[in-house]
């Protein structure tokens, strides 16, 4: 088991990473020295089917536990589901010494975390991610639900009290979910660690990744994320760099319809556009064709649907949280492993997006 410590302006908490950690859940939670009267255990339908009863029985050995299951997929991050979980917490007689455990992927973590942040003005919250994608979202304290006009527009910054990351769960993931999570690992390498990126470029099949490689990738990815969050907890500066690939990615997700494309596939599209615009506007030197070819070889899409209009995507991007005064703050690379933000007008970005789309279809 590996342990990382995240220190932010508002809190400090451990991240436990390793195989079989779920079996030590009671021991690890007790080690936090937090008063725990009751636990609401939130999971999704798919994770519940595979591991829900096992985790419920483990936790019930020590505390009163209420299990609440939400639909699998992005549709669970809704105000309706948020209200349902608040009602479940009230009916279960949760108090300020109670705790919510998010047992699932990023959707469950975002939803359950936002409930914890707002129930009785904030109660303890534990992340137990079960996907590779959630290695990114479980650390850093961003919790939210979606609005029909945009992703993650209603939320808060609320740090967990601990993250328990059992890597055994990742071996049961379908390949599309493994690929989705790998996109965030790749993002971390693009923006902060060129040597790590070179390591990743040697991977040609996601199913050939060994347990040791997987644990190492997760540890490096979380270490990069933790380092950024420690310096900028509430995205007032460098934390925005973690949105590399996400400005277009979120627009594509929203326009296709949540659940119609995985978050990682959408971010991979966004990163390919970000590489293009980094090369064309700030002169980032790289072998872009090699990078794009590698992403394609791992199964990531390289083109936006032809029927999706560029102007519609720009409308989505104008609603992005990084937009200021009608200008879009877009995360670019000065060089591989070194990131910066760049401001574009709507017309500028629309022009570059049209040029990139034309290049990808030629």
Curated annotation (Swiss-Prot):
Name the UniProt record assigns to this protein: 3-dehydroquinate synthase
Keyword Acetylation: no
EC number: 4.2.3.4
Involved pathway(s): Metabolic intermediate biosynthesis; chorismate biosynthesis; chorismate from D-erythrose 4-phosphate and phosphoenolpyruvate: step 2/7
Secretion signal, residue range per the UniProt entry: none
Biological function: Catalyzes the conversion of 3-deoxy-D-arabino-heptulosonate 7-phosphate (DAHP) to dehydroquinate (DHQ).
Organism: Bacillus subtilis (strain 168)
BP-aspect Gene Ontology terms: amino acid biosynthetic process; aromatic amino acid family biosynthetic process; chorismate biosynthetic process
UniProt-listed InterPro entries: Dehydroquinate_synthase (IPR050071), DHQ_synth_AroB (IPR016037), DHQ_synth_fam (IPR030963), DHQS/DOIS_N (IPR030960), DHQS_C (IPR056179)
Reactions the enzyme catalyzes: 7-phospho-2-dehydro-3-deoxy-D-arabino-heptonate = 3-dehydroquinate + phosphate
Alphabetical UniProt keywords: Amino-acid biosynthesis, Aromatic amino acid biosynthesis, Cobalt, Cytoplasm, Lyase, Metal-binding, NAD, Nucleotide-binding, Zinc
Similarity remark: Belongs to the sugar phosphate cyclases superfamily. Dehydroquinate synthase family.
HAMAP family named among the record's database cross-references: DHQ_synthase
GO cellular component: cytoplasm
Domain of life of the organism encoding this protein: Bacteria
Names of the cofactor(s): NAD(+); Co(2+); Zn(2+)
UniProt subcellular location: Cytoplasm
Transmembrane segments annotated in the record for this chain: none
Designated gene of the protein: aroB
Cofactor-binding details, from the entry: Binds 1 divalent metal cation per subunit. Can use either Co(2+) or Zn(2+).
Chain residues that bind Zn(2+): 184, 246, 263
GO MF annotations, alphabetized: 3-dehydroquinate synthase activity; metal ion binding; nucleotide binding
Family annotation (Gene3D superfamilies): 3.40.50.1970, Dehydroquinate synthase-like - alpha domain (1.20.1090.10)
Main location: cytoplasm
């Amino acid at each position: 088991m590996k342990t990382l410590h995240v220190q932010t302006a508002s809190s400090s908490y451990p991240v436990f990473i390793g195989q079989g950690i779920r079996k030590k859940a009671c021991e690890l939670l007790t080690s936090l020295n937090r008063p725990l009267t009751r636990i609401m255990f939130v999971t999704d339908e798919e994770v519940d089917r595979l591991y829900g009863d096992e985790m419920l029985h483990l936790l019930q050995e020590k505390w009163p536990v209420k299990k609440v299951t939400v639909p699998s997929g992005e549709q669970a991050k809704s105000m309706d589901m948020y209200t349902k979980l608040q009602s479940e917490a009230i009916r279960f007689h949760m108090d300020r010494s109670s705790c919510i455990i998010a047992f699932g992927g990023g959707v469950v973590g975002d939803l359950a975390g936002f409930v914890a942040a707002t129930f009785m003005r904030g109660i303890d919250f534990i992340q137990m991610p079960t996907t590779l994608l959630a290695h990114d979202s479980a650390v850093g304290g961003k919790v939210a639900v979606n609005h029909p006009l945009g992703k993650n527009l209603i939320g808060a910054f609320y740090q967990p009290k601990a993250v328990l990351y059992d890597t055994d769960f990742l071996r049961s993931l379908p390949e599309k979910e493994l690929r989705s999570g790998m996109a965030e690992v790749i993002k971390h390498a693009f923006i902060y660690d060129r040597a790590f990126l070179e390591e990743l470029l040697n991977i040609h099949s996601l199913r050939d990744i060994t347990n040791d490689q997987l644990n190492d990738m997760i540890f490096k990815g979380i270490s990069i994320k933790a380092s950024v969050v420690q310096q900028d907890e509430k995205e007032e500066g460098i934390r925005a760099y973690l949105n590399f690939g996400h400005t277009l990615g979120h627009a594509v997700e929203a326009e296709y319809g949540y659940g119609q494309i995985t978050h990682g596939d959408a971010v991979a599209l966004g990163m390919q556009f970000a590489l293009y615009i980094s090369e064309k506007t700030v002169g980032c030197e790289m072998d872009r064709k090699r990078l794009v070819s590698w992403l394609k070889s791992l199964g990531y899409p390289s083109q936006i649907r032809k029927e999706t209009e560029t102007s519609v995507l720009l409308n989505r991007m104008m609603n992005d949280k990084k937009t200021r005064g009608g200008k879009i703050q877009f995360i670019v690379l000065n060089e591989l492993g070194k990131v910066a933000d760049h401001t574009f007008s709507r017309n500028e970005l629309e022009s570059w997006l049209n040029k990139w789309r034309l290049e990808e279809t030629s």
